[in-house]
Regions:
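Bacterial N-terminal signal peptides
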Residues: 6-15
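Short active-site neighborhood of thiol/selenol oxidoreductases, capturing the structured segment around
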Residues: 40-68
Length: 167
């Protein structure tokens, strides 16, 4: 019985994609409008959620941003803020921002500098789609890699955060 519990527990832990305490989020990032943002200011009294876009033309990624936008009020209950990471030129990212109207910073991943640290680069032209929650010190709190037309990670992040039960 202990063996089965141990195996089950190992499976559950490995499937949540939890990561050790290496600091992976940069101290400073620049959004596509040229604004320098410090991680400490983003994370002040908030949990930073990084959303990576597989590509600028990924329809599944765009739909997910639209759904997250619809749930902003719910996510604000548990002090969540977002940053979107994309590998594309600034002009294309700005066109995307206009299209999805997602009211959080978009970051251009120049030369895969950020995604490489997170093991999310899928060179030569894409990122691995992911949702990552960061602790206030820049270490990873939770992550889920991958999305498809059958699985968006929305439910996983909602279940993990359980914002409806925050006071």
């Amino acid at each position: 019985m202990r063996f089965l519990i141990s195996i089950s527990l190992s499976f559950i832990i490995s499937n949540t994609n939890l990561v050790a305490s290496e600091k992976l989020f940069p101290n400073y990032i620049t959004d596509v409008d040229g604004n320098e943002l410090s991680f400490s200011s983003l994370a002040e009294n908030k949990t930073v959620c990084l959303i990576t876009l597989k590509s600028i033309n990924c329809p599944i990624c765009l739909e997910q941003l639209k759904r997250f936008k619809e749930k902003i009020t719910q996510f604000q209950k548990c002090n969540l803020t977002f940053v979107v990471l994309a590998y594309a030129d600034n002009k294309s990212i700005k066109a995307l921002i206009t299209k999805v109207d997602f009211p959080f910073p978009f970051i251009q991943d120049v030369d895969f500098m950020i995604s490489k640290k997170l093991n999310l680069d899928n060179q030569p032209f894409e990122l691995k789609p992911a949702i990552i929650l960061f602790n206030g010190d820049g270490t990873i709190k939770w992550k889920k890699i991958g999305r498809s037309n059958q699985y968006f990670s929305d439910q996983a992040i909602e279940d993990y955060l359980d914002c409806d039960n925050w006071i």
